[in-house]
Regions:
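Short beta-strand His + acidic residue motifs that chelate non-heme Fe in jelly-roll/DSBH
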Residues: 78-80, 98-99, 120, 125-131
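Conserved short histidine dyad/triad with adjacent acidic residue
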Residues: 66-83, 111, 121-122
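A short, N-terminal "cap"/entry segment at the start of jelly-roll beta-barrel domains
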Residues: 23-66, 153-160
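Short acidic-glycine-tyrosine-enriched beta hairpin
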Residues: 96, 102-123
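His-enriched metal-coordination microenvironments in redox/metal-binding proteins
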Residues: 47, 60-65, 79-90
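Bacterial N-terminal signal peptides
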Residues: 9-19
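Double-stranded beta-helix
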Residues: 30-33, 107, 127-160
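Glycine- and acidic-residue-biased ligand/ion/polar-headgroup-sensing regions
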Residues: 73-76, 82-103
Length: 160
């Protein structure tokens, strides 16, 4: 049976080890919580009409970690594009269809149902679409980021 000195020592160790962690969690000025009702959606001009963005953390236009939600309407087509940075994507709702390649080929599209996680390497040509439902996905990466279209005519930011 442990002595009372050992028990007190163990309790003191636990208190001393846990206190800085609890203190750090309680005092973190960067702690953020966003519930769906608080999302602020706005048009995403770098993607075809109908795409929307909600910034959850950081800024995709500035250096540092960012997390965004992207909302795409049903029957949305995203032309061949790439990103200069590495990113991770998680599908929140709806089924997203995506493929790697520098030419749209519907037979290559893979379904990404809700909950699907994917790692997207930098500078990889890809294309995507939604079908009969709206899709929301989360992107986390290190900014600044951008989207580059293989065919300049597909870039909605450029005058037609």
């Amino acid at each position: 049976m442990p002595s009372s000195k050992q028990i007190i020592g163990l309790m003191l160790s636990v208190i001393l080890l846990e206190s800085p962690i609890a203190l750090a969690q309680d005092q973190s000025p960067a702690y953020a919580r966003i519930v769906p009702a608080d999302l602020k959606w706005s048009p995403l001009p770098s993607m075809p009409k109908g795409a929307q963005i909600a910034v959850l953390h950081g800024s995709p236009a500035k250096p540092g970690l960012f997390t965004i939600y992207v909302k795409l309407p049903a029957n949305f087509k995203l032309p061949v594009h790439s990103h200069p940075d590495e990113r991770v994507r998680t599908i929140i709702s709806g089924t997203y269809y995506s493929a790697i390649g520098d030419k749209v080929d519907s037979s290559k599209l893979m379904a990404f149902p809700p909950g699907t996680f994917s790692h997207v390497p930098p500078k990889v040509w890809q294309f995507a679409e939604t079908r009969d439902e709206q899709v929301v996905f989360q992107i986390t990466g290190i900014g600044p980021t951008d989207i580059d279209y293989l065919n300049a005519a597909d870039d909605p930011r450029k005058p037609q």
